[in-house]
């Protein structure tokens, strides 16, 4: 996901975290963004304009009446040029000014003139942040359509421990991506995505599971959220970071995933079952650890609930997309699932194909619908996710 052709305006005010914005500016440039920076006068006490000018290739604006550049009404031109504005760190002072329409410097004047999405990341001492006046000002900004990025907690520069830290750079960048990286063509849709493995306990120590890492499902959830959908991510145990802008529903067993999916199904417009749900579980779970003995041991297994098999025949308006992992007869086996479970689409992949399957960042899939099949080339899982969502959007509009 990139920001080619997008202009990001960073507003840096006078907080100790101002230095972090150099990393943000650099990362945004690597994503292809055109980055402009406006600093308050106090911000220049923490980091110099030259740093931002070197990283962005643009003059860093501070003084509204600076004449050392080609004439134009700069606070208006930047307000029109920006696709998104991020004010970070946003001090209590700057937040108060923006909340009350005070435009007494280049930053606040530009923010007031801009009509693009505006993000604000408060960063200050805990006492200042929690002061009712600051909280009222933050609420006012939200009421006017600003997106407020919550502060993080930890040890502050003043050695206090509490909320008020500027979020990590990747969090700020993710908010920018969410605001402008993709058209919001999935806005208004409630999409549920399942991801990762399930774990079926044998005793308090052991369980049956599979090799799924959840990467494909997480990529789908992130892509859908970036495109404006209301996303619920129902997932088994993974080592992946939570997907921002989604409702996170962790589960462990196939039974829990069944309950999580079916309880939300009526309110769901699109269900994408990317999870590797166990087909079988131990028929009985031992209360104590099973001790090793001489000889072999057999474990009786029983079927787990078939999630798509249960809800497929009951669907009304929902679009159902299943996943099929095969090692042979890919299209034949996956097409049978499409018909048997009353699905709208099956995403099939062959574990034996190089670059596909578990634990890698790429995939090779075949999209199977009632109209036929379409094999996609080797792509990143992020690109595969967008291709799947494109197909779903197209078929829902038919």
Model-derived segments and their meaning:
Residues 1-119, 125-398:
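A cross-family phosphate/adenosyl-ligand binding-site feature
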